[in-house]
Amino acid sequence: MSTARTQPSVTKILATVIILACINVVSTASTSKLVRIGSFAANSDLTEVSHRRFLRTSVAEERKLALSFPWLGQAVSGTQSWAATLLQTLQQKWSQMRMKSPNDMFKKLKLDNTGDQLFSSPRFSKWLSYVRTNSKTNPDMAIFSTLAYHYSDEALVKLLDAAKKVDSTKVLATKLEGLQFTNWVHARESPEYVFKVLALDRMGSNTFTSPQFSKWLSYMNKAETSDPEMAIYRVLGTYHSDDVLVKMFAAAKQAESTRALASSLEKVQFENWARGGESPSHVFKALALDQMDTQIFASPQFSKWTSFVSKANTKNPDVAMYTTLGTFYSDDILAKMFAAGKQVDSTKGLATRLEGIQLANWENAGKSAESAFKTLKLDTLPGSQLFESQFINTWASFVTRTHKDPDAIMVALLKDRYGDETLAKMIAAATKTERTEKLAVDLRSAQFKTWFSQGKTPENVNTLFKVAANSDDLTKKISREYDIFFSKSKVAFNRPANRPARNGIYIAG
């Protein structure tokens, strides 16, 4: 009888088995919601799958409750320790069943309603303590998976970024941020997706100065790409227009830390334009050269554009450049532009060629000397400023290529506008300036020829200029020079046709 009393009845054993099975089922099913995270292993105790997996919000050790009854054989065989083993197992199972998962505790503490104030909540500290106590294998992963369940990637980025600025939460937030990036890498999230999650699509030309940009670059370095620079450029191009990219790269080249990358991306951009067959006008506008006005030749972007056009249009790049410039600027602005470009050695050659194309276009269009004078806005200047204008030489070049006797044409037009006396003084003053000296000397000769052909003597000129009563240098200069001219011209005029002149000037009758 004593032996019978120590042996458990079959009914008791079966009841115990049923209780444990129920406990195990309840414990296993205690958390049913899933959180999608990337298939990476944290501390080597998370099972890895090929691409994605779904983790429950509880950590691994809280879920893996298997039916294992080492006491059952002893109970059946009649050992004396079955009762103690049974009690211990029941206690363990009951404790595990009552233990809440990190996600359950998160919700119990109503942390799911704190939004972006999560890290500043006192309840959050309690929850962290609970997770670290009951998730001994990988508490950080348990924390991250719970937060990932309740927050979108964008919201979590903002949450962790804010927490990193607070000393008390900086370390944890940094760890969780690392887990988030590692999760993206193993989940093979696209660079475009991560770029947008980090709100870099809204940074514009300041993208390179954002701390998030360096994080994104770090992500790109971990991602599998055969051409990292092209991959970076394509993502930037997905969210930003060409002109914004130009500003972005230009700004980034000013900082030493981003200069190399920005220069490489700028090169990729030009290569991409060339491969895509972008027009000179598109690139011109993207480089903001349509806003440079007359100082365009001094812009670093202009030299890049001319290089692009030369490579894209090898047959006649100068015409392509002029056509584009003419699309955005008027004739008078172009003339100023070319005149300014001719003053600098590095751009003198190109500016001269483009000016030649402009003058040829005017000639083909039948533009007159007077029309060109007005196009260059020379008609708006007082006589005292005419030869100071950088356009006077441009106008002279045009008249020279379109008329057989350009100096006479120019003098006639200027005389009608300013009068003989004023024009003579304007020309005399211009001979003292190196830039206009040659033109002024030629115009002086043409004016003197006109006077001579009209029969004006030096005395007539002195009377016209009131030399006796006028002691200014210009008046005396005009009187003296015409007197010399008249004497030589008279000698040449009176010399027989078959005798060559010596040190004189032949004047057509």
UniProtKB/Swiss-Prot annotation:
Induction of this protein: by what? Answer: Expression is induced during host plant infection.
Q: Which Pfam families match?
A: PexRD54_WY (PF22748)
* Localization terms from the record: Secreted; Host cell membrane
Motif location (RxLR-dEER)?
Answer: 53-63
List, alphabetically, the GO terms of the cellular component aspect.
Answer: extracellular region; host cell plasma membrane; membrane
Instruction: Please provide the record's keywords in A-Z order.
Output: Host cell membrane, Host membrane, Membrane, Secreted, Signal, Virulence
Q: Tell me which InterPro entries the record gives.
A: PexRD54_WY
- Report which residue ranges the record marks as coiled coil: none
| Signal peptide segment | 1-28
Q: Which family does it belong to?
A: Belongs to the RxLR effector family.
Q: What is known of its domains?
A: The RxLR-dEER motif acts to carry the protein into the host cell cytoplasm through binding to cell surface phosphatidylinositol-3-phosphate.
Summary of the function given for this chain in its UniProt record: Effector that enhances P.infestans colonization of Nicotiana benthamiana leaves.
Protein name, as recorded:
RxLR effector protein PITG_16195
What organism, scientifically named, is this protein from? Answer: Phytophthora infestans (strain T30-4) (Potato late blight agent)
Ranked from the top, the taxonomy reads: Eukaryota, Sar, Stramenopiles, Oomycota, Peronosporales
